[in-house]
């Protein structure tokens, strides 16, 4: 891998949509996925509202808002993550749920892709050891609310 260009985020709830938001503002292409299509659409709408709020408060320009919005795409399936450079899991704080996500996700990723968890309480070492790439597994914790922190 020569650099990070595309980031996949699993979980479109409060943390996941916030992570997708800041990644897009930072210039990365973002794929956002959720197990529930309605939550995925709600997450995209939340990002749009939060970007609009940032423009209204003069935190970002309209051009920056529009560029960030264009960088975010809904991913209906983890199959869409085949070319991401980094996959960030931001699902519920339950180890069995996170492990199930990694079991499904890792075989779909490139071998050089980095896998990250947003966990705040589960052992990152234990989660990484259960994947096919413990040496490319990291903890990447964001504080809430992500777009403001």
Language-model features: locations:
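Short, flexible turn/loop "capping" segments at secondary-structure junctions
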Residues: 24-25, 81, 145-147
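Short amphipathic alpha-helical segments
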Residues: 20-22, 44-45, 99-102, 127-129
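Rossmann-fold dinucleotide-binding core
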Residues: 114-149
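Rossmann-like NAD(P)-binding element
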Residues: 38-39, 53-114, 121-122
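Short coil/turn connectors at secondary-structure junctions
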Residues: 4, 27-28, 83, 110-112, ...
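Hydrophobic/aromatic beta-strand patches that form the interior of the parallel beta-sheet core
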Residues: 31, 73, 88, 138-140
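NAD(P)+-binding Rossmann beta1-loop-alpha1 motif at the extreme N-terminus of oxidoreductases
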Residues: 1-53, 57, 108
């Amino acid at each position: 891998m020569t650099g990070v260009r595309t980031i996949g985020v699993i979980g479109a709830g409060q943390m996941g949509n916030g992570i997708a938001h800041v990644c897009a503002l930072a210039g990365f292409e973002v794929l956002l996925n959720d197990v529930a299509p309605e939550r995925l659409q709600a997450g995209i709408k939340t990002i749009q509202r939060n970007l609009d709020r940032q423009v209204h408060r003069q935190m970002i320009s309209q051009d920056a808002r529009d560029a960030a919005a264009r960088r975010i795409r809904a991913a209906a399936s983890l199959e869409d993550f085949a070319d991401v450079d980094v996959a960030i899991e931001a699902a519920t704080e339950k180890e069995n749920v996170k492990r199930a996500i990694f079991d499904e996700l890792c075989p779909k990723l490139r071998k050089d892709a980095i896998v990250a968890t947003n966990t705040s309480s589960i052992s990152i070492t234990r989660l990484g050891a259960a994947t096919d790439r413990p040496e490319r597994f990291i903890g990447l914790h964001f504080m809430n609310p992500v777009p403001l922190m």
